[in-house]
From Swiss-Prot:
Gene3D superfamilies: Viral capsid, core domain supefamily, Hepatitis B virus (1.10.4090.10). Belongs to the avihepadnavirus core antigen family. Residues 215-234, 252-262 have a biased composition (Basic residues). The modification Phosphoserine is found at residues 232, 239, 245. Self assembles to form an icosahedral capsid. Most capsid appear to be large particles with an icosahedral symmetry of T=4 and consist of 240 copies of capsid protein, though a fraction forms smaller T=3 particles consisting of 180 capsid proteins. Entering capsid are transported along microtubules to the nucleus. Phosphorylation of the capsid is thought to induce exposure of nuclear localization signal in the C-terminal portion of the capsid protein that allows binding to the nuclear pore complex via the importin (karyopherin-) alpha and beta. This is Capsid protein. Residues 183-262 are annotated as: Disordered. It comes from Duck hepatitis B virus (strain China) (DHBV). Transmembrane segments: none annotated. GO terms for molecular function: DNA binding; RNA binding; structural molecule activity. One of its GO terms (biological process) is viral penetration into host nucleus. GO terms for cellular component: host cell; host cell cytoplasm; T=4 icosahedral viral capsid. InterPro entries: Hepatitis_core, Viral_capsid_core_dom_sf_HBV.
């Protein structure tokens, strides 16, 4: 991956959240784009990575949805006077990346106990599920951005997606009164430019550019009795003979050379 594509991929994380499709729509679109490559057993980079993220997102999404459903069902058995665990006592995504997966439950339990030692067991389970679901959602957000990048590179080409991300970020960072009303689209960027053809016929060959070299002055010539004479040369004095009469021969021309025959 060249430096421009690498920079564009990093900039994907800065795009607004509502720019990307919802998880269900994203996975469906990605599968449609990947299906021809799956049938041909392609091992292209974008195919392999996009396939990995499709599987990852589907598993994480189903698990996260299950966590939310169980957490909501526990609300009915939590004592009504129980205060929710503040956000500061819940493990965040950045912290979870530094904690081994097997120790995640222990770290979260210690934080709940530090908030309230006798916290009800049902409320503790609810707090754990909410914390893990939040971590999964942030991981899903990163994964869906990467999935969007890789399957769009298959659809439009990596260079076009790189160009599109650059233009879109420029549009987003430009004040509203100085930019166009609509954001750029990748369809418009990849559409071939059509030049309107006029009614004038053009030659198929290459046209010589004008104005680069001075024009050469054409030298007019006239034919005088079978000989070409340039008008740019110095003219001889006019002959007294009338036009069309033979030129008088010089005196030397009257002397004939001796003939080889006797």
């Amino acid at each position: 991956m060249d430096i421009n594509a690498s920079r564009a991929l990093a900039n994907v994380y800065d795009l607004p959240d509502d720019f990307f499709p919802k998880i269900d729509d994203l996975v469906r679109d990605a599968k449609d784009a990947l299906e021809p490559y799956w049938k041909s057993d392609s091992i292209k980079k974008h195919v392999l990575i996009a396939t990995h993220f499709v599987d990852l997102i589907e598993d994480f999404w189903q698990t996260t949805q299950g966590m939310h459903e169980i957490a909501e069902s526990l609300r009915a058995v939590i004592p009504p006077t129980t205060a929710p665990v503040p956000t500061g006592y819940l493990i965040q995504h950045e912290e979870a990346e530094e904690i081994p997966l097997g120790d995640l439950f222990k770290h979260q339990e210690e934080r709940i106990v530090s908030f309230q030692p006798d916290y009800p067991i049902t409320a503790r389970i609810h707090a754990h599920l909410k914390a893990y679901a939040k971590i999964n959602e942030e991981s899903l957000d990163r994964a869906r951005r990467l999935l969007w990048w890789h399957y769009n590179c298959l659809l439009w080409g990596e260079a076009n997606v790189t160009n599109y991300i650059s233009r879109l970020r420029t549009w987003l960072s430009t004040p509203e009164k100085y930019r166009g009303r609509d954001a750029p689209t990748i369809e418009a960027i990849t559409r071939p430019i059509q030049v309107a053809q006029g009614g004038r016929k053009t030659s198929s060959g290459t046209r010589k550019p004008r104005g680069l070299e001075p024009r050469r002055r054409k030298v007019k010539t006239t034919v005088v009795y079978g000989r070409r004479r340039s008008k740019s040369r110095e003219r001889r004095a006019p002959s007294p003979q009338r036009a069309g009469s033979p030129l008088p021969r010089s005196s030397s021309s009257h002397h004939r050379s001796p003939s080889p025959r006797k």
